[in-house]
Design a protein with these regions (language model features):
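An N-terminally biased module of ancient metal coordination in phosphate/nucleic-acid-related enzymes
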Residues: 1-79, 370-372, 381-384, 391-397, ...
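Divalent metal-coordination and catalytic microenvironments
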Residues: 8, 42, 86, 134, ...
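Histidine-centered divalent metal-coordination motifs
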Residues: 8-12, 138, 196
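Histidine/acidic-residue-rich catalytic or RNA/ligand-binding cores of hydrolases
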Residues: 15-17, 49-50, 144-150, 199-211
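Extended substrate/RNA-proximal surfaces in nucleic-acid metabolism proteins
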Residues: 2, 49-165, 398
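C-terminal functional module detector
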Residues: 28, 46, 57-60, 70-72, ...
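Short acidic/histidine-rich active-site segments
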Residues: 186-202
């Protein structure tokens, strides 16, 4: 069977996270996005565990509420500020891991994403001890990621590098970025939302399509490990330019700089603010390949833009959270079942019967790869622009649908 999976979210017990990030809300919103399995996130937090345990237990590591299945995950920050994503096979595994790290964390009961005074190798060793999967979260992000502080996997994970099976690309990178670094070729790439709110523009803005026998933790683990015929068949995510840290830019005024310009200015903007190195420039520093070399098993990467963002641009709204945008998004999802279906597969003529012409044309422009993206940087997301009608034939190649990828 084919499932869509988002393996990195946060609960309302994490800092800077919406109070609406409850199990009930996630279970309701995931199907409307087109997602079958959602990570719990924050599973070390005792209060969040109590909410998770309200779900029906499918097996030791898989839980069900409504139509949505959940698996146990968390993110932790090590002593070097590197974030790691962990997937657990059971609550007993979670409890064993928590017991090992509690004495190294001062906020394990107060923050869903705890700080742990251990390095990556030590955390990976504890993960291995409890049979959990571990890998770098949003690996290229310049603040709290592996490649922000390390130049290689082994620098971060030491002798446990061989145990690392996946890498989360993050919103400012895609497979073309990752596969310019040959040490990553053996790893499965994951694309996840890292959602801090359940809003359509955040939840499942990136996800993984997997071929599995059933929608359970063990089958998802086998897909990540590429075992028993299971695999990740498609990575779906934002164009890297939409990420907050794609290009090097000032974190105060968001002025963009080339790498040479930033170096010459000693990473200080003309406004006096700090210039933060972008993912694109960091990948260019790390890359040992001039162009991406994808291993045979690497799935295609499908770029996607959240439907609410497309609707907002079509209606001339400055925010994705206005009543007008919400109304049009809800109308479409009610008619076609999920956001993924609307963006990629629903018949455009049928869409035109449900929504206004401006929204139909915007969805069509996205499908045809004709949306212009102005890159993000310095902590500000990239923005999209809908081309004028006469410009649309010259912008980009046509965007494939999920069905197109399944045929290849």
């Amino acid at each position: 069977m084919i499932i869509n999976v988002d393996l990195h979210i946060h609960s309302h017990f994490s800092g800077a996270t919406s109070t609406s990030m409850t199990i009930e809300t996630l279970a309701r919103e995931a199907p409307r996005k087109g997602i079958d399995v959602v990570a719990t996130g924050d599973c070390l937090h005792s209060e969040w565990q109590r909410e998770i345990k309200q779900c029906e237990r499918i097996d030791e590591g898989t839980f069900l509420l409504g139509e949505t299945r959940f698996i146990l995950t968390t993110e932790v920050e090590d002593k070097n500020r590197v974030h790691h994503l962990l997937l657990f096979p059971s609550f007993s595994s979670v409890d064993d891991f928590k017991e090992r790290i509690t004495k190294f964390s001062s906020n394990i009961e107060t923050d869903g994403r705890p700080n742990v005074s251990l390095n990556g190798e030590q955390i990976a060793e504890f993960a291995k001890d409890v049979d959990a999967l571990i890998g770098p979260a949003h690996a290229f992000t310049p603040w709290t990621a592996m490649y922000a502080y390390h130049d290689s996997l082994s620098s971060c994970y030491g002798d446990l590098t061989r145990y690392i099976s996946f890498l989360e690309l993050g919103l400012s990178a895609d497979s073309n970025y990752g596969d310019r670094i040959s040490e990553l070729h053996r790893l499965t790439f994951l694309t996840n939302s890292d959602a801090h709110s359940p809003y359509p523009v955040r939840l499942a803005r990136e996800f993984n399509r997997m071929s599995v026998k059933e929608a359970t933790y063990r089958e998802i683990k086998n897909a990540i490990l590429r075992k028993n015929g299971n695999s990740v068949t498609l990575n779906v995510g934002l164009p890297p330019q939409e990420g907050k840290y794609n290009e090097s830019a000032c974190i105060s005024c968001f002025r963009h700089y080339t790498l040479d310009e930033a170096v010459k200015r000693r990473w200080r903007c003309i406004c006096g603010g700090r210039i933060k190195k972008g993912v694109r420039d960091r990948v260019n520093e790390l890359a040992d390949l001039p162009v991406p070399k994808h291993p045979e098993y690497r799935p295609p990467y499908l770029h996607i833009i959240p439907l609410a963002e497309i609707i907002a641009k079509a209606l001339g709204q400055n925010s994705t959270f206005t009543k007008k945008v919400t109304k049009r998004w809800t109308e479409l999802v009610d008619a076609f079942g999920s956001e993924v279906n609307i963006l990629l597969d629903a018949d455009i003529e049928e869409i035109s019967k449900v929504t206004v012409p401006a929204v139909t044309e915007a969805i069509k422009a996205f499908r045809e790869g004709k949306v212009i993206i102005h890159p993000g940087g310095g902590g500000r997301y990239g923005t999209i622009e809908l081309p004028n009608e006469e410009e649309r034939d010259t912008v980009r190649d046509k965007q494939k649908t999920l069905s197109d990828f399944l045929k290849t």
